[in-house]
Amino acid sequence: MLQTVVAAFRAAGVDEIVVVTGALHEPITALVGDAAQAVFNPEYASGEMLSSIQRGLRHLLSEKSEAEGVLIGLGDQPQVQARSVEAVCAAFRQSGARLVVPSYQKRRGHPWLAAYPLWELLLALGPSQTPRDFLNAHADQIHYVDVDTPSILADLDTPEDYLKSRP
């Protein structure tokens, strides 16, 4: 599942991919190989996506990444398509927006992109806050990109979900 997501990001031209891991750090690191850099989130047990986003951002900052923005994607979203990732990246480059979010039938999904100036605001969020809270607080800055696939909305949380999603 994760390999498919990483492959979609690579096919879309994303150069630097960081996969934030938890309990399965070693097998996931082996799974992604050279296609992505695996970074361990010591707070993974909280189950909160925000702690993983913050861990990934801290890693990029510590590595002095030259990234202009960060795509926030889901590892359990194997149906995400490279063309959706490309559309978000293209809209970021063309619009100058600080937040770019894909939308399918007026519902926002993943991956969304936050420009570098917003990273500190994401890092400042407290443990009771969520990425959705962040997006809602900055709704006036969001540039929506309409995509033609519901794959941006679906994440597969169980093996059963994955089996149901297969053609």
Set out the residue ranges of the language-model regions.
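Short glycine- and hydrophobic/aromatic-rich loop-to-beta-strand nucleating segment
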Residues: 110-114, 154-156
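Flexible, glycine/proline-enriched loop segments at strand-loop-helix junctions
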Residues: 115, 121-122
